[in-house]
From Swiss-Prot:
It comes from Aspergillus terreus (strain NIH 2624 / FGSC A1156). This is Autophagy protein 5. Gene3D superfamilies: 3.10.20.620, Autophagy protein Apg5, helix rich domain (1.10.246.190), Phosphatidylinositol 3-kinase Catalytic Subunit, Chain A, domain 1 (3.10.20.90). It is found in: Preautophagosomal structure membrane. Conjugated with atg12.
Length: 315
């Protein structure tokens, strides 16, 4: 019971996490070019940027060169890079602005990981020139965003249970309520519905829904992000040395973040216990390699049920 309480405390801390944003209207769309006042907000890390579009459109309406634009025409960018609207804002920050200063230029390294990109995180919003090659268009009713979220929930449900029957059999009210609870950052309502989908604590997942994001160098000629995903059981398979040792005690050994990273990315994580070349980052914090992956998912998943870990190079 005490262990479960600890996981619940971690989940509450995750949902309480916020990120200060400073959002400016693109100078190309502003009547006053770059003189428009920015929009400042402390925004939940688990939330999605499109939820801000109605209030941003209203805030910038008097400055828009094209006042006939609609809120759902809006899209966000950071340093000229369009931001994927289906990813939570906390993940986007960890990907694009949370890199070590040593990897962001020729200046001396600093212990302050936000030295290169001090908070608030500065974003640009535009309501025209949608980047069709990089982003799927949104709609006025918000159904595109809703459907993308639910599809991601289905994928996570399938990973955990080997079937998406749980989310498919949710009532329409609960399905809509799950998305609304994330939009409203309403953890009690979210827990009530998500607990229907999660196996009970004494029943292990079939696989854990985790994706690893690998930022690539700008001159790689490839997309700026690479995603690594593979079925990860919550306990070590019999072929591993640790599992062989566990066979003696007949106690399954938990799959830790270190064993998972070593199996999937051995060149970046040659050690199962200690980060040597890279480190795993979730919700802006470096995770311990000893963390059992199922506990990480139960306590620290985003609203869609996935854990999105950013692999950040060291040094």
């Amino acid at each position: 019971m005490e262990h479960q309480a600890t996981l619940n405390d971690i989940q509450k801390a995750v949902w309480d996490g916020r990120l200060p944003l400073q959002i400016t209207l693109s100078p190309s769309e502003s009547r006053s070019y770059d003189k428009t006042d920015p929009y400042l907000i402390s925004y939940p890390r688990i939330s999605y940027l499109p939820s801000l579009l109605p209030r941003l459109h209203a805030f910038f309406s008097s400055s828009l060169i094209e006042p006939t634009s609609k809120p759902h025409d809006g899209w966000f960018s950071f340093e000229g890079v369009p931001l994927k609207w289906h990813l939570p804002v906390g993940l986007l920050y960890d990907l694009y602005a949370g890199a070590d200063p040593a990897s962001k230029g020729s200046g001396p390294a600093s212990d302050d990981e936000t030295a290169e990109f001090p908070l608030p995180w500065r974003l640009v919003v535009q309501f025209s020139d949608w980047p069709d090659e990089e982003l799927v268009r949104l709609d006025a009713d918000g159904m595109v965003m809703h459907d993308a979220f639910i599809n991601s929930v289905k994928e996570a449900d399938f990973m955990r249970n080997g079937t998406a029957k749980g989310i498919m059999t949710l009532s329409k009210e609960d399905s809509s309520g799950l998305w609304k609870s994330v939009q409203d950052v309403d953890l009690p309502s979210f827990q009530r519905i998500s607990n229907i989908l999660l196996p009970p604590p004494n029943q292990p997942f079939r696989n854990v829904p985790i994706r690893f994001f690998l930022p690539l160098p700008p001159d790689s000629g490839a997309p700026s992000l690479k995603v690594v995903q593979s079925p990860l059981p919550p306990t070590l398979p019999p072929s591993s040395m640790a599992a062989s040792q566990a066979a003696i005690s007949r106690t399954p050994q938990p799959q830790t973040l270190g064993t998972a990273l070593h199996a999937l990315l051995p060149n970046l994580f040659p050690s199962r216990r200690t980060p040597v070349l890279a480190k795993p980052v979730l919700h802006g914090a470096v995770l311990p390699m000893s963390a059992p992956v199922e506990e990480v998912v139960r306590s620290s998943a985003y609203g869609d049920g996935w854990v999105y870990i950013v692999v950040r190079m060291m040094g």
